[in-house]
A protein has these predicted regions:
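A helix-centric hydrophobic-segment signal that preferentially recognizes long
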Residues: 2-210
């Protein structure tokens, strides 16, 4: 009787572990594909920055500190190898996410400062790069959201019964995802404006009101 119960228990366990196995395979492939697209779009952004920086340097009085921060942020972001294995390492993923968020912030500041330089904003090369950057940032947002959804689906499968038994048997574990506290910053593309009118100096509005 005990032997029969053992056999039934093992058979039941094997049957349950079969539940969700195909789902794991499918969602894992979805994660890899969406991660690849995230990396591609971040790389595209990084490739645009050298030309953007060189164009901005043509503006003799442009704030050097703003440019330096963009250059340093790009260097930090591109120094992290975004390998397929990175999405299985929470610490490495967090480091990658933070570096990309810092680059987004540096680019946003550069675009904000450029509003004060009408000659730069009238430069066709700069305007073209702005448009390319805006398009890339939008594609980053789309790719990141797909990754977030894929990881959420995968992690739910890892944690819920009976697929959690399959996860234990085959070693499937939670994968890191973009943190909620960074999501707003990451998803906010640098502001792009093609209005060539110079920015109003501080105090102008109050002076006009007097």
């Amino acid at each position: 009787m005990r032997k029969l119960l053992t056999i039934l228990t093992v058979a039941s366990a094997l049957s349950l572990t079969g539940c969700g196995y195909n789902t794991f395979q499918t969602t894992d492939e979805q994660i890899k594909a969406s991660w690849s697209e995230v990396v591609n779009q971040y790389q595209r952004r990084a490739d645009l920055i050298p030309n953007l920086v060189n164009t901005v340097k043509g503006e003799a009085k442009f704030e050097q500190d703003t440019l330096t921060k963009v250059i340093e942020a790009r260097s930090k972001a591109t120094s992290i190898q975004a390998t397929p294995e990175l999405i299985n390492d929470p610490a490495a993923f967090q480091k990658f996410q933070q570096a990309q968020g810092e680059l987004t912030g540096a680019l946003s500041r550069l675009m904000a400062v450029s509003e004060n330089y009408p000659n730069l904003r009238a430069n066709q090369g700069f305007r073209d790069l702005q448009a390319q950057l805006e398009g890339t940032e939008n594609r980053i947002t789309v790719a990141r959201n797909r990754y977030i959804k894929s990881v959420q689906d995968y992690n739910v499968t890892v944690r819920t019964f009976p697929s959690n038994l399959t996860a234990m048997v085959f070693g499937y574990k939670d994968k890191p995802n973009f943190a909620v506290e960074n999501e707003k910053e990451i998803s906010k593309p640098p502001s792009v404006s093609f209005d060539t009118a110079p920015a109003a100096p501080k105090g102008a509005a109050s002076g006009a009101a007097k």
